[in-house]
Amino acid sequence: MSLLTEVETYVLSIVPSGPLKAEIAQRLEDVFAGKNTDLEVLMEWLKTRPILSPLTKGILGFVFTLTVPSERGLQRRRFVQNALNGNGDPNNMDKAVKLYRKLKREITFHGAKEIALSYSAGALASCMGLIYNRMGAVTTEVAFGLVCATCEQIADSQHRSHRQMVTTTNPLIRHENRMVLASTTAKAMEQMAGSSEQAAEAMDIASQARQMVQAMRTIGTHPSSSAGLKDDLLENLQAYQKRMGVQMQRFK
């Protein structure tokens, strides 16, 4: 796996799924291929994206700044600086300075990532802030190692939280999760259907699922009732995906 592929993988792991994720993936690919060379326009686009957390925007802004060639005097962006200040916690800043001193002696991506993984996400973000604000300088490889370590810390905590939701025994949460998954899968099918021969069938299955979810939410149902919806939709999807040759996300 090349260095830039690895960076793209880690950064995208902290971006919520949806159309915006696909858009960000495309921007990263363009930036890494040297196609997107206007940093100002790119940063303005990033600043106005909805859904993304300030920290995710800060990390993406840091990656874009590292990768896109720019004028030396180009102003640093406030939204990136604010995101990479470690929540203003002096403890994070102290640790960031210690980490920076270690990284300064490092020259490889993997070496930097290994060192950085022993620090908290707050300290890692503060260290990125030091480099972003030109208070310290490291090689691009080392900076990317720092980025990937930060994303790994964030993705780990997101995964723990997601696993808790998926394995919860609370029937109300499981019920709502099934309905949300049914709705998002229906939406994905409608988007995919545009160019396929089976478009009418896909739209029909998606529409039925959507109506069922709407009815359940309106009249209220027993938390176990959505299990049937999940099974029916899954059966329809599996038949559809065999013909389409597409692997759909499985329901939990």
From Swiss-Prot:
Documented effect of changing residue 155 to G: Complete loss of virus ability to be rescued in a reverse genetic system
Alphabetical list of InterPro entries matching this protein: Flu_matrix_M1, Flu_matrix_M1_C, Flu_matrix_M1_N, Flu_matrix_M1_N_sub1, Flu_matrix_M1_N_sub2, INFV_M1
Membrane topology: Peripheral membrane protein
SMART domains hit by this protein: Flu_M1_C
Xref: SUPFAM superfamilies: Influenza virus matrix protein M1
BP GO terms, sorted: viral budding from plasma membrane
Outcome after substituting residue 41 to A: Induces short filamentous virions
Its biological purpose: Plays critical roles in virus replication, from virus entry and uncoating to assembly and budding of the virus particle. M1 binding to ribonucleocapsids (RNPs) in nucleus seems to inhibit viral transcription. Interaction of viral NEP with M1-RNP is thought to promote nuclear export of the complex, which is targeted to the virion assembly site at the apical plasma membrane in polarized epithelial cells. Interactions with NA and HA may bring M1, a non-raft-associated protein, into lipid rafts. Forms a continuous shell on the inner side of the lipid bilayer in virion, where it binds the RNP. Determines the virion's shape: spherical or filamentous. Clinical isolates of influenza are characterized by the presence of significant proportion of filamentous virions, whereas after multiple passage on eggs or cell culture, virions have only spherical morphology. Filamentous virions are thought to be important to infect neighboring cells, and spherical virions more suited to spread through aerosol between hosts organisms.
Family: Belongs to the influenza viruses Matrix protein M1 family.
Assembly information from the UniProt record: Homodimer and homomultimer. Interacts with NEP. Binds ribonucleocapsid by both interacting with genomic RNA and NP protein. May interact with HA and NA. Cannot bind NP without genomic RNA.
Name the UniProt record assigns to this protein: Matrix protein 1
